[in-house]
């Protein structure tokens, strides 16, 4: 008959600590012995100060004789715990001058150290061993190398540092769980695999390393699943009607596995992948890759990132096969990525730019209709967003009238059109509009794709998103609260204002009756029994008008933003993208603009002095020209793109009467004049006249007016 009866383990408390808890990681294995009518935690027995292992392993309890256990329990019953003030404190601090005694759980609560080696010494919270505190060279938190949750890199009771790797930090609980699973033969530093130094330090700091084989070595067919390939779509929203397990090679329903872990997969169609894309990584692997690269080289974050590959994809869930972070932990980490890493937006976009291939695609753009030209080129089946882009400007139907153009200038013109197009509404901070013609032509998807391509290929930042639109993209519509500022329709805004300003229930019901049809069709009609109901009614109308009403355009817009993995980066680093999607770049100062230009060849000292004086005069408002005008004249862009100018800006002084700009090379030639007045006059005249002519050249663009549904107007 087996003396250990697990079924009774809950009825008998441990004879030492008087707790029923069965927690092997904290107290060791709990065993109940029916023959002697007691239960005991392994660690409580092992750490008791007045008992020694006098029997063989198979005798008594773990080699401790039963009579010795009873004597130790009797001895402990006379000792009061320093923590809980109850009797039974069988463990005492090993320091001779210290008189503290405690139960094992109380000692753990007070952060005592129990050494599972040699004489199994116990140290109270005053005399416990500590790790040396070195100078903290880390400006922010670092991840625990086991669970990847962030810790402050300062050694404490709960945070331990590896003795052999300065960058390896651990939670105490994570180390203990790993030690129990790995055993003495496989427990080692997670970074350098050192065993001797690492185990010695961990034993000193109270980590129990059992003398057993690793748990995975004892499991039958532990590695059997490694022989199987993963053929399941793990994307959050699988669009395959035949289910996640359906896999049809050489079709859009072929399952592509993560190139790094192989334990997550996606249908090509579910992640908007094309057949020409060979690589795909799941969200877990991409997050680890970028975290590792950023931690290793904060000054040069791109130096070791050549293997990074990002593709269009939905936000995936972790594969159920991998024991990684919990869903809650992943969600928290996702929301705090920006604040933890403080990643610069240029670094993120440059990483996305690693996908761009050397193979080029030439876009033929009519300056008089940039929008329609770009739309035709991007909708072409041969267009590949991961190819490098060359731009050639054509002049209508004039044969032979074409010249090489600046890609960044083209993208700048395209962003200007998108900002003022019919797919957005609002004055400065814009939301998506409801445009039936745009839905029919799939323009919301195309606009999203254009924005993504512009950001990755070095174009300017949009800067016109409303905070509500951005929050919908980054955190989801369900976590977004629209405001009255998001309502650009005057009639709807008046309804909301009337309801919100109602001072009694009769006035509120009168307003509801007046706009009954609109409230009913929009799904916002509700029974109002008190004046306070108006707040929920206003909230419902705002959510319907700003979010639910444009649900289909929003989903299409999101699909477009998934191009080149941009949407996923927005959701991973919302803080970084908020600055470029919702805010225009700050105005350039004279010094900032001057610093953008590199002096080319030998410069004329006087001309450079005139140039700096000219910039200063513009900054002081003494010229009709602006800093933005100079930037447009030299590059075609009204602001500095998030990834900077490629090629970098250069300035040259030549013996010419008027300034000359080469936007393809971002090169500016300054005129050589005898006086500053002549220099300023020539610069002002040329820049303003050139910009005026270019504006006239682009004046014949696609009309903006695409009306909303007449049914909605009738309802309002």
UniProtKB/Swiss-Prot annotation:
Any single biological process term in GO: apoptotic process
Gene3D superfamilies: Hect, E3 ligase catalytic domain, Hect, E3 ligase catalytic domains, Zinc/RING finger domain, C3HC4 (zinc finger)
Expression sites by tissue: In the developing embryo, expressed predominantly in the central nervous system and early limb bud. In the adult, highest expression in Purkinje cell bodies and cells lining the ductus deferens.
Pfam families: HECT, zf-HC5HC2H
Zinc finger (PHD-type): 79-128, 141-195, 237-286
Top-level taxon in the UniProt lineage: Eukaryota
E.C. numbers: 2.3.2.26
GO CC, alphabetical: cytoplasm; nucleolus
InterPro entries, per database record: EPHD (IPR034732), HECT_dom (IPR000569), Hect_E3_ubiquitin_ligase (IPR035983), PHD-type_Zinc_Finger (IPR051188), PHF7/G2E3_ePHD (IPR042013), PHF7/G2E3_PHD (IPR042012), Zinc_finger_PHD-type_CS (IPR019786), Znf_FYVE_PHD (IPR011011)
Disrupted-gene phenotype: Embryos die prior to implantation due to massive apoptosis resulting in blastocyst involution.
HECT domain span: 369-696
Catalytic activity, as annotated: S-ubiquitinyl-[E2 ubiquitin-conjugating enzyme]-L-cysteine + [acceptor protein]-L-lysine = [E2 ubiquitin-conjugating enzyme]-L-cysteine + N(6)-ubiquitinyl-[acceptor protein]-L-lysine
Protein localization: Nucleus, Nucleolus; Cytoplasm
Uppermost EC category: transferase
Zinc finger residue extent: C2HC pre-PHD-type: 11-51
Disulfide bonds: none
Keywords recorded for this protein, A-Z: Apoptosis, Cytoplasm, Developmental protein, Metal-binding, Nucleus, Repeat, Transferase, Ubl conjugation pathway, Zinc, Zinc-finger
Molecular-function GO terms, alphabetical: ubiquitin protein ligase activity; zinc ion binding
Pathway: Protein modification; protein ubiquitination
Record note on domains: Ubiquitin ligase activity is mediated by two distinct domains, PHD-type zinc fingers 2 and 3. The use of these distinct domains may allow ubiquitination of different targets by each domain. The HECT domain is catalytically inactive and does not contribute to this activity.
Function: E3 ubiquitin-protein ligase which accepts ubiquitin from an E2 ubiquitin-conjugating enzyme in the form of a thioester and then directly transfers the ubiquitin to targeted substrates. Required for prevention of apoptotic death in early embryogenesis.
Name of the protein: G2/M phase-specific E3 ubiquitin-protein ligase
């Amino acid at each position: 008959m087996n003396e250990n009866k697990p079924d009774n383990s809950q009825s008998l408390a441990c004879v030492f600590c008087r707790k029923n808890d069965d927690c092997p990681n904290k107290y060791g294995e709990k065993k109940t012995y029916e023959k002697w009518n007691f239960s005991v935690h392994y660690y409580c027995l092992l750490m008791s100060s007045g008992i020694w292992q006098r029997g063989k392993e198979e005798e008594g309890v773990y080699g401790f004789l039963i009579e010795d256990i009873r004597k130790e329990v009797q001895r402990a019953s006379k000792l009061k715990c320093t923590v809980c003030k109850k009797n039974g404190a069988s463990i005492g601090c090993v320091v001779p001058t210290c008189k503290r005694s405690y139960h094992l759980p109380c000692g753990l609560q007070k952060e005592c150290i129990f050494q599972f080696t040699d004489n199994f010494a116990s140290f109270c919270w005053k005399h416990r061993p500590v790790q040396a505190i070195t100078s903290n060279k880390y400006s922010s938190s670092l991840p625990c190398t086991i669970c990847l949750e962030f810790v402050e890199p300062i050694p404490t009771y709960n945070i331990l540092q590896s003795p052999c790797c300065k960058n390896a930090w651990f939670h105490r609980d994570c180390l203990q769980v790993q030690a129990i699973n790995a055993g003495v033969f496989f427990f080692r530093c997670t970074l350098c695999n050192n065993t001797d130094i690492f185990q010695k330090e961990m034993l000193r700091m109270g980590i129990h390393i059992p003398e057993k084989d690793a748990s995975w070595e004892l499991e039958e067919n532990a590695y059997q699943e490694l022989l199987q390939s993963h053929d399941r779509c793990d994307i959050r929203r699988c669009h395959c009607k035949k289910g996640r397990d359906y896999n049809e090679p050489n079709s859009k329903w072929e399952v592509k596995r993560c190139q790094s872990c192989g334990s997550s997969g996606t249908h090509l169609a579910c992640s908007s992948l094309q057949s020409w894309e060979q690589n795909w990584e799941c969200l877990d692997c991409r997050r680890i890759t970028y975290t590792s690269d950023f931690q290793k080289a904060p000054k040069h974050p791109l130096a070791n990132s050549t293997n990074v590959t990002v593709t269009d994809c939905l936000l995936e869930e972790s594969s159920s096969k991998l024991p990684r972070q919990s869903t809650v932990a992943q969600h928290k980490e996702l929301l705090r990525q920006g604040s933890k890493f403080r990643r610069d937006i240029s670094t993120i976009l440059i990483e996305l730019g690693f996908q761009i291939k050397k193979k080029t695609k030439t876009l033929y753009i009519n300056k008089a209709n940039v929008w329609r030209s770009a739309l035709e080129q991007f909708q072409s089946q041969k267009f590949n967003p991961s190819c490098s882009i060359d731009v050639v400007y054509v002049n209508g139907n004039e044969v032979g009238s074409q010249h090489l153009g600046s890609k960044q200038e083209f993208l700048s013109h395209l962003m200007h059109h998108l900002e003022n197009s019919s797919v957005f509404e609002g004055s400065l901070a814009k939301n998506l509009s409801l445009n039936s013609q745009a839905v029919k032509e799939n323009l919301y998807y195309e606009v999203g794709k254009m924005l993504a391509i512009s950001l990755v290929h070095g174009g300017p930042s949009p800067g016109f998103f409303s905070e509500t639109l951005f929050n919908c993209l980054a955190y989801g519509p369900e976590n977004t609260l629209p405001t009255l500022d998001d309502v650009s329709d005057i009639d709807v805004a008046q309804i909301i204002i009337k309801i919100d300003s109602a001072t009694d229930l009769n006035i509120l019901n009168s307003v509801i009756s007046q706009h009954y049809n609109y409230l009913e069709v929009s799904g916002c009609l509700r029974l109002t029994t008190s004046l306070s109901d108006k707040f929920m009614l206003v909230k419902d109308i705002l959510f319907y008008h700003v979010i639910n009403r444009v649900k289909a355009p929003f989903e299409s817009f999101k699909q477009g933003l998934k191009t080149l993995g941009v949407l996923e980066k927005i959701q991973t680093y919302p803080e970084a993208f908020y600055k470029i999607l919702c805010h225009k770049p700050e105005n350039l100062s004279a010094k900032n603009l001057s610093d953008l230009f590199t002096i080319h060849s030998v410069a004329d000292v006087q001309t450079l002095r005139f140039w700096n004086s000219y910039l200063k005069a513009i900054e002081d408002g003494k010229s009709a020209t602006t800093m933005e005008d100079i930037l447009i004249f030299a590059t075609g862009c009204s602001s500095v793109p998030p990834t900077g100018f490629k090629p970098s800006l250069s300035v040259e002084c030549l013996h010419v009467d008027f300034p000359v700009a080469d936007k393809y090379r971002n090169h500016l030639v300054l005129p050589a004049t005898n006086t500053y007045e002549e220099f300023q006059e020539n610069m002002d005249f040329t820049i303003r006249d050139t910009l005026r002519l270019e504006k006239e050249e682009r004046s014949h663009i696609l009309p903006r007016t695409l009306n909303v549904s007449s049914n909605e107007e009738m309802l309002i």
